[in-house]
């Protein structure tokens, strides 16, 4: 705890306004959970505007679960803790630390039947929507590190649905939670309509099967990792996860930010995923990729193919050797794409193709772009 309120900016700004009343644990005045911090939301709006100019999305995590699980130091300063706000939140005081530093407050925090917390949660979720409603490049997610219960995930989506009905607006909403909760929501014909993006972040396939913590067990992702073997992952496992959900729910985008995701950008791309971590050194190829869809290949195939007869095809080859594919009749340019640097090199300037085409692979893990002329 701070000795006093003698602090220098910049502060760790929160979404809620200070009241000028009382003294919170950090030595400053208490928060009002019903009033937005205008400076905080102004900065997020400014970030979204600057990002839009560069084609960058803002993923707005409404909550941060780390405040209520694991590190007690985050909870002591959290606006939702009773001593830090004027709203009478009824969490236990003094803080029930485990081993003098760990905190397990998720069960109480996610209690939507709590008459004090429920309206505060609803008002805050609506605040997140209201304050970013004019920004088309903002994606709303429930919480960073979220392993919370299904009932709170439903509550969050129901609140968004109510807001959408009242305002006529539809922000981009990503469903980012454990697999069991994700599958339950996607099976709900009404709540699934609210979801635009399926975000695979808190589960993954590994070489022996599936790593998927259960929702609502009052444990953070890192704590689950200590209890359950994470296992080894690779291109095939990332590809299969994305392709499975793109196939089941073709009207929704799928993002993948799970185990070791930066390594699997090409797997995500070839499976039809969005926001893959790939370098592409050609604006034309980037544009054409947005028009392509699945053609052939599975996670363990020698090659995966995506394409569109109108613009061409992209082939990801895992090894050396010939790759034969069916293509629309026409003239094409064949390029090789370095999957690490993104450098695009032309292999053949003009090829007239009728029906099938064979690429002679010269290296492992190489992408080929068959550009329609």
What are these regions (language model features)?
Residues 3, 9, 15, 24, ...:
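A sequence-composition feature that detects small, non-aromatic residues
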Residues 16, 80, 353, 359-360:
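Aromatic-residue hotspot detector
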Residues 115, 120-123, 134-290:
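Extracellular glycoside hydrolase catalytic/binding regions
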Residues 222-350, 356-373:
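Aromatic- and carboxylate-lined catalytic core of secreted/periplasmic carbohydrate-active enzymes
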Residues 1-186, 190-197:
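Active-site mouth of glycoside hydrolases
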Residues 50, 66-68, 142, 150-152, ...:
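Generic marker of "main functional regions" within proteins
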């Amino acid at each position: 705890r701070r000795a006093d309120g003698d602090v220098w900016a910049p502060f760790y700004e929160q979404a809620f306004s200070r009241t000028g009343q009382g003294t919170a644990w950090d030595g400053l005045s208490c928060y009002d959970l019903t009033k937005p911090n205008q400076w905080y939301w102004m900065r997020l709006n400014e970030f979204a505007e600057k990002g839009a100019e560069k084609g960058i999305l803002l993923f707005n995590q409404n909550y941060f679960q780390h405040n209520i699980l694991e590190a007690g130091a985050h909870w002591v300063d959290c606006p939702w803790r009773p001593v830090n706000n004027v709203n009478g939140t009824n969490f236990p005081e003094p803080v029930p630390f485990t081993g003098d530093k760990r905190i397990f407050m998720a069960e109480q925090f996610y209690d939507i039947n709590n008459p004090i917390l429920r309206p505060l949660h609803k008002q805050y979720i609506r605040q997140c929507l209201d304050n970013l409603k004019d920004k088309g490049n903002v994606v709303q997610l429930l919480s960073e590190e979220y392993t919370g219960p299904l009932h709170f995930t439903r509550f969050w989506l129901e609140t968004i649905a109510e807001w959408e009905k009242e305002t006529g607006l539809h922000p981009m909403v990503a469903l980012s939670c454990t697999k069991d909760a994700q599958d339950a929501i996607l099976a709900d014909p009404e709540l699934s309509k609210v979801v635009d993006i399926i975000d695979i972040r808190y589960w993954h396939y590994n070489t022996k099967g599936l790593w998927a913590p259960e929702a609502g067990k009052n444990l953070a992702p890192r704590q689950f990792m200590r209890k359950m073997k994470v296992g080894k992952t690779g291109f095939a496992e990332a590809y299969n996860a994305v392709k499975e959900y793109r196939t089941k729910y073709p009207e929704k985008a799928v993002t993948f930010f799970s185990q070791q995701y930066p390594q699997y950008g090409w797997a995500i791309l070839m499976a039809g995923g969005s926001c893959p971590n790939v370098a592409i050194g050609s604006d034309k190829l980037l544009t054409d990729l947005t028009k392509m869809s699945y053609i052939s290949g599975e996670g363990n195939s020698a090659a995966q193919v995506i394409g569109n007869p109108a613009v061409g095809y992209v082939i990801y080859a895992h090894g050396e050797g010939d790759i034969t594919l069916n293509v629309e009749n026409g003239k094409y340019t064949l390029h090789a794409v370095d999957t690490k640097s993104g450098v695009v090199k032309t292999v053949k300037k003009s090829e007239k193709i009728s029906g099938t085409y064979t690429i002679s692979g010269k290296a492992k893990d190489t992408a080929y772009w068959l550009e329609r002329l």
